[in-house]
Amino acid sequence: MSKIGLFYGSTTGKTESAAEMIQAEFGGSSVVTLHEIADASDSDFDGYDFLIIGCPTWDIGELQADWDGFFNDELDNIDFSGKTVAYFGTGDQLGYAENFQDAMGILEEKISSLGGKTVGSWPTDGYEHEASKAEKGGKFVGLALDEDNQSELTESRIKEWVAQLKSELRI
């Protein structure tokens, strides 16, 4: 089994594409195993000490449909104690400036309450949003991607974030 489990939900393919880029940047499937949350169960989280959670913000500050179902039906069954968790999200900072990356913040708050330790915070500099549930202490709780308005920055942001995670996790 790989060292890292990456669990994501994707409706339009943008979050899935980011998940694949993150996996490649870490070194491929021998290091990071991808799990679509639509096909995952709570037991899939058991074999990993390090998790990456990816979710787009959907509608007006909501979880993506697959994450919404998992959040309501299975997330409470997982013991995140002893697990280190990083987050990334996709969203539209201009069209939804008042709730940019809210889904990432919703998941981070819930998983932290279940014992998960958050790593991988990301600066808010360079973004044009008004508010976000994913902001804590002047930073995002994870990597914020905007394929609608800043797609040209996605690759470099992922490279920088993965390097940061490797340093934080000493891998």
Where are these regions (language model features)?
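N-terminal beta1-alpha1 ligand-phosphate binding loop
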Residues: 3-25
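A short beta-strand-loop structural module common to alpha/beta enzyme folds
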Residues: 29-41
